[in-house]
Amino acid sequence: MASSTATVSLHNLVKLCCKRNSTSKVFVSLYNQLEEKSPIQDNDYLSNLLQPDIKNKSKRESSLITEYILALAISSESQLEKFWKFLPEILLENQIHYMIELNSILLSKSNIERPSSDIFKEIVNNCFFKYTSSYISSLFPGISATQVSLLNHIIVVWCSVIRRSPFHLNTSSFKQLAVKIVSVLTECDLRNSLNYFISNTSSILNTDDLQVDSVQDSDDKKIAAIRSTTTIQLVNNISSINPKSRKATQLNVIKRYLWLNSIMKNWKFSNDVFLKQFEQNFLPNSSNNLKKPYVLAFELICAFFKGIVTSICSNESKYVLFNWKNFIITRLPTLLNDIKFTTSHVAPTSNDSSFKQETLDDAIINAFESFEDPVNKVLTQFSIDNLSICDLRQTFIKSCIYNKLIPVMSYHKIFTADNTVTDQFLNNGIEQVGQITSIRDEFETKLLNINTEFTTLEDSGLIEYINSLPGLLEFSATKQLELSETVDQVIEHLIDEKNIEKLYRLLLSVCNNLTTLNLICFNSNCGPFSILYKLINYIDNEDFNVDDDDNFQETYAFFGIIILAILLIIETFKIDYSQITVTNSYIVDYINEFYYRLCDSLTNISTSDTEEDNTIISNYNDLISDWINALFDDNNDGLSDDLIKSVNVKQIYKMIPIIYQQSIIATNSNKIDIKILNNGIDYLSQMFLIPCTLNIIKWLLRRIWADDPTLDCLPVQVLHELIKSNMGESDEPTSESKLFFQIVLKISGNSIISTLKKLNNWENSNLIKDIIEKVSNSVDPMYLENDLSIKLNERVNLYEQLKTNVINLVNNMNIYDYQFLNIFSSIDRDNELIRYIVEEITSYQKTNGGNEDTKLFINLSIFMILLDAIDNDDDKQYWIKRIKDTMVPVSSNSSGENRFDISMDYHYSSIFNNSDETSNNDYLFSGENNNSSVEIEGLKRKIGRHESLLNSFNKIKEFCDTEVQSTFVKSLRTFRDKLINELEVFTLNV
C-alpha cells in the first residue's frame, strides 16, 4: 500500500476522490498521507486544487473540489495560511465561489463541518481580515461588476460572522476595517451594499465610528451614511421585543399558527427541514436547553393541537381542516419519532425536579394538561362533518401506538380514566395497520388487469375499495404515500396508453369520495397539482375524435369525467385560475369563459365581414338551430347520432351551456313554455351531457338574483327539474349516471345550498327543501362548507380593523378566531397595507418608541406579508433583489395589467374554430405535446408575485432615496431596511 501511494499525484488523488464522490474528510486524510511521502509543490496546489481547469469538469466535480480545498484549509493553521496566501492570485470568479462556500460553512449549510474555535478565530481575525483589507485597498470608483460581486460576497461573509459568532471577533480591529469598507462602498456609490453592511454591523458600529474618515470626501455622502445609521437604530428598536414578555410569547404563537396553517393550505407537507425550521424560528433558545427534546416535543404537540382548534374556530375551508387532522394523525408521530430522547438530556446533579420530565410520554401528558378549556372542548368532541365525533387526542395516541412510537401501556398512562379502550384493542390495531395489503396490487386486481367488456365497474369492486381507503389507511403514513404514488402512476400509465375507459372508472370512483381524493393529494409531493396537471395536459393534447365509433357517446362521457375531475379539484381545494389564460389551452379557456364567467364574454357579433366568414357563421348558426330543434321540438326525433357526431365533443361542451341559457331566457320571456324547456332538460341526463349541467347550474344560481328572487322563480324550478331528472328517486340504486351527476353536485353543492338559503323564508318552499335535501345527500358531509364570508365593519378602515384584531390576539391568549388574519390578503383589494405600516412606523417615532402594541403590529404585519409572498428560495431571492433595487419600476397604463393573458376575439364561432386543434396536429408531427401545466405554473408564479403585497412597495420605494428629510421618508426607509432584514433571515418555506 505504501509503495503504491508514493506514485499517486495530487492530480490523480483529486480525480479519484471526485470519481468516488469521497467526503472531504476522506480527501484531507489522503492528502496528508500523500504530502508525508512527498511535499506538494505550490504550482501543483494551485493548478489541481485552488484553481483547477474546470472546462472538462462537471458541476458536481467542481463543487467537490471546492469542498476539498476548504476542508483542507481549515484542517490546520499551516494549510489555512497556504490557502489565504494563494487565494488573491486566482481569478475573481473563483474567489467569489470560495466566498459563497465559506459563508455556507459559517451558516452550517455546507457539507463541511464548521472549523474549530481556534481556526475560526485565526480566519476572522487574521487571514480573512488581511485578505479583505488588501482587496478593498485595491478598489476605486468605476470598479467592474465582478469586483463589486466579490466585494458583496466578502461583506456577506463578515455579516454572517457578526450574526452567528460575534464573540470570536476582535471588535476593535474590525471597527477599523469596517470604517474602510463603509468608505469604499460610499465612494463607489454602492448604496444597497452599504445599507446591508451597516444594518448587520449595527451591534458593533455606531454613528461616531461612521464619522471617522469614512465619508470625509463628501458631506452629502456623510449625511447619507449617518442618516442610514439613524434608520438602522429605528429598525433595531422596532425589532427589539423582550422575548420573555407575555406579549412576545403570544406573538410567537400567532406567527407559529399562521405558518402551520399556510402549510396546510399550500400542501407543503414534505418539507424535510420542518423540525429545523420550527426550532430555529419558534424555539430560538432550545439549542442550549438541557431539556431540548422534551421542549421541542411539547411545543410541537401544543402547536398542532391548538392550531387545528384555531383553524376550526377561524372557519377554515374543510380541506384545510382535513389536512390538519391527517397531519396530526400520520405526520406528527413521525416528527416526534425524529426527536431522540436520550439520557444525555438529563441533569442528574440538578435539584430541579423538572429535569426528570424527559420522556415522550411526559411531553404528551404535559402538553395535553396545558390545553385551556376551549381547546379541550373542541378536541374531545372533534368533528369536521358535524356527524362523526371523536376525541382527537385519543386518535393521535392510538396512531403513536399503532406506529410503535410509544408502547401500548402509554395509552392508559395518558388517559387514566378511559376504560373503553383495552390493551387487546390496541394490539389488534397494531396488527391491522401492519397487515394492510399492497395498494398497487389492489389497483392491479380491480382496475388495470380486468377486461372492461366483461367486468362492470360495480363488479370490479373498485368503488367499494376506494370508499374503504380513508378508514383503512387512517393510521398508516406509509400506505397513504403508497396510495398517492400508485394513483399518480396509474393515471400517467392510462394516459400514456390512451386507455380512457379505465381512466374514466378511476376518476369516477375517486371523485365520488372526496376524502380519498384529499388523502391522495395530501400525500403527493405537489398536492392536487400532480393529478390536475396530468389531466389538463391530456385534455389539451387529445382531440377525442370518434369517427365511426359506435360507442362515441361513451367516449364523450369519458371526456366529460376528466372535465369534471379538473373542476372538482379546483373547487374543492380552492384553486383560482380566473386570471390565467394559456395559448391554445382548451381547458383553461373553458374554465375561464364557460365556468367562471358563464359565457359573459361571448357575443354573436362577428369581427369580420368577409363573404367566406359570413358563410361559415351561417353554417354554424344552422347547425346550432338543428341542435335546438332536436333538444326542444316535440315534433323532432331528438338527438341523432349523426347530429351529435357533427360536432367535436370539445365544441359540444361549449355549445350546450349557451343553448340552455338562451332557452331559459326564452321561457322567462314566454317565447317557449315550461313543458318544452323540461323536455330539453331531460336530455341533460344522458351521460355525455351530464357535465354540461354544471355550467347551467352555476348560471341558474346567479340568475336567481338577477331575476326577481322569489321562492319558486323559474331558475329554482329549472334547478329542481335538472336535479330530479338526473338523480331520480332516493330509493333507486346508484347507477353510473347517478354517480356522474353526484360529482356535479359535489362541485356545485355548497353554492346551491348557500344561495338558496339566502332567500327569505326558503323553508316555506317544498322545491327548495327538496333540492337542498338531494344535494346534501350527494355532497360528502365533511366537505359541506360553512359560510366562509366574514363581516367587515364598513365604517372602519380595513387596516385599523386588522390592527385591532392583531392587538386583541396578542393581548388575549384565549382568542382562537384568526379568520381575519387568515383571509386578509384576499380581502386587501387595494394592497394598501404597506402604506399603513409606514404610517404606523411614523406613529411609533412620535411616541419615542413608547407604544408596544404598535411595534407588535408592525412585526406581525411584515411577517404576514413575507409568509404570503415567499413560497420557496427563488421567491426570497427575487424579493430581496427587487426591494434592494433602487430603480423605479416601469408603470403600465394597460387596463389589463392585473391579468396575464393573450387577447382574442370572443364570438360564437370561436366555439367551433378551436385553435388548439391545429396546434395539436402540429404536435403529432413534431412528436411533442402542448404542456399547458408548465405555462400555468409559470403564470401562477407571475401572478402571485404581481399580487403580492410586497409588489405594492415598488410604487413607493422610489421615495427612499429622495433628499427630502420628512418623517414619512424616514419611516419609509425604516420599513425598507426592516423588510430587507426580515427577508435575509426568513427561512420558512425555503
Swiss-Prot record:
Keyword annotations of the record: Activator, Nucleus, Transcription, Transcription regulation
Coiled-coil segments: none
Taxonomic superkingdom: Eukaryota
Gene Ontology BP, a term: regulation of transcription by RNA polymerase II
CC per GO annotation: mediator complex
GO molecular function, one term: transcription coregulator activity
Cellular compartment(s): Nucleus
Similarity section: Belongs to the Mediator complex subunit 5 family.
Subunit structure: Component of the Mediator complex.
Function text: Component of the Mediator complex, a coactivator involved in the regulated transcription of nearly all RNA polymerase II-dependent genes. Mediator functions as a bridge to convey information from gene-specific regulatory proteins to the basal RNA polymerase II transcription machinery. Mediator is recruited to promoters by direct interactions with regulatory proteins and serves as a scaffold for the assembly of a functional preinitiation complex with RNA polymerase II and the general transcription factors.
Protein name: Mediator of RNA polymerase II transcription subunit 5
Species of the source: Debaryomyces hansenii (strain ATCC 36239 / CBS 767 / BCRC 21394 / JCM 1990 / NBRC 0083 / IGC 2968) (Yeast)
